[in-house]
C-alpha cells in the first residue's frame, strides 16, 4: 500500500491499474534461492490453509452423529452454514485490515480465532455452543485463507506466485476431498469431538512458527484513532448483511422452504440489493480506503479474471457436491466411501496446479492454462451426463481426472495476472477480492445445481409408482434421501428401486448439462484476458526481510524491514 502520509492523496486520485502490456519475448527470471526461514513460514501457512480448508467439509459425514449427540436435528444446517457465512463475509475485512495493522498481526489473529473456535466446537454440549463455535471458526478460517494468499504474494514476485499458489491450491484440494473421510473416521472410531480437537496441536505448531519467523515490514499507520478512521465501516456492514441474507436464502431454498416461497425470495432479493449497494458505496468520493475498491474492476483483464474465478469456484463445488449424489443414490456407496470415490479430483488437481504454476514461473505465459482448464472441465462435465448405474469404475475415475486437471490449472493461473494488471499497492485488496469472489462462487456452486436438480426431480417423479416414495423425493427431498440406506431400503421392490434410480439419473443429467453451460461461458471469457508481463521484481512495503548475522543491515533479496 502507499505510505500512510500519502494515502489520502493516492486514494483521491484513484490510482490507475498497471498498463496492460502485451507479452512478447518474456525472459525467464533468474532463480531466487529461498532461505530456510522462508520455507518454515511457507510450510506453516500451508498447514493453516489445510486446517481452514479441512473444516469447510469435514463435518459433512459426521453431521448425523453430531446432531444426534447434541439433539440439534432441526438446526443441523446452521452447523455448516455458520462457518461458510462467517468465513465469506470477513475475507475482504481481513484484507483491508492487513494494510492498516500489518500482515503479521492479522495472520496471527486469524490463527488464534480459528483455534479458539475449534476448541469451542470440540467442547460443545449444546447446539448454540456448536453453532457459535463454528461461526468463530469461520471468522478465523476466512482470515487464514485471505492472509495466507496475501503473505505469499508479499514474499515472492508475481512471476513466481503461480508456483506457490499451485502448492497452496493443492493443499486446499487435498484437504477438501479427504475431509469427509477424516470426519467419518473420527465419528465412527474415536469421537466426533476430535474432528475439532485435532486442529489444536497443528494450529499451535503453525502459530509458534509464524510467531517466531514471520517478520514482515509494516509502514507506520498512525495513532489508534487514525487507524480506526481508515476502516470502511459502512462497506463492512453492507457486505456482512448482504452475505448473511444471501446465505440464508440459499440455505433455506429447496430444503426448509420452496424456492418460490417468500421466505427464500425476500432474503435473496434483500441480499442482492445490499450487494449492489455495497459496490455503489465503494465508489463514494468521501471513502478513504474502500474494502473492495472499484479500481480492481477497472481493467479488462482483472475484471474478467475475477468473473472466471467465480465460475471456476462455482464449478468445483458443483461437481464435488453432486458427484456424491451419484455415488450414493446410484452406486449405493456409503458417505465415507463416496468421499473416497472423489479422490481422483484431489489427486490430479493438486499436481496439475503445481505443474501449471511452475510453467508460468518459467515462461510467464498463463492464458494457455485458462483455455486448457476450461476445455478439460467442459469435456468432463459433458461426459458426466453419460454416467448411469452400469458405468464402470474406469469411467467415473477417468472423467474426474479430466476435471481435476482442468480445475487445478485454472486455480493456479488466475491470481498472478490479476495482480499483474494492478499496482503493487493493491496486492492485499485484490487478493482479498479474489478470495471473497471464490468463496462467494462456492455458495452458488451448491445452490444453483440444487435448484436445477430439485426442479428436474419434480418433473420426473410421476414415473415413480409408489406415492409414498414419490412424496419423499419431490420438493427438495431427493437430495436429502440420496443415501445408501434409502436406496437399499427399496431392494425388496426391484422395480420401484429402478424407478427411483432413474429419477436420480435424470435429475443429475440436467445438473451436468447446466454445468457444461457454465464451463463454456468460462471458456469464452478466456478470450478477453490479455497477455501481460508478470513482474519478476518484488516491490512491496510488507515484504519478508532476512537479517544478516551481526549486522543491522537487511538483505534486499526478499523484502523491506521488520514488522
Curated annotation (Swiss-Prot):
Protein family per UniProt: Belongs to the major facilitator superfamily. TCR/Tet family.
Domain of life: Eukaryota
Species, as recorded: Gibberella moniliformis (strain M3125 / FGSC 7600) (Maize ear and stalk rot fungus)
Protein known as: Efflux pump FUS6
Compartments where located: Membrane
Residues passing through the membrane, by range: 39-59, 75-95, 105-125, 138-158, 167-187, 194-214, 233-253, 261-281, 305-325, 340-360, 368-388, 401-421, 433-453, 509-529
Listed PROSITE patterns: MFS
Residues bearing carbohydrate: 189, 299, 553
Molecular functions (GO terms): transmembrane transporter activity
CDD domains: MFS_Azr1_MDR_like (cd17502)
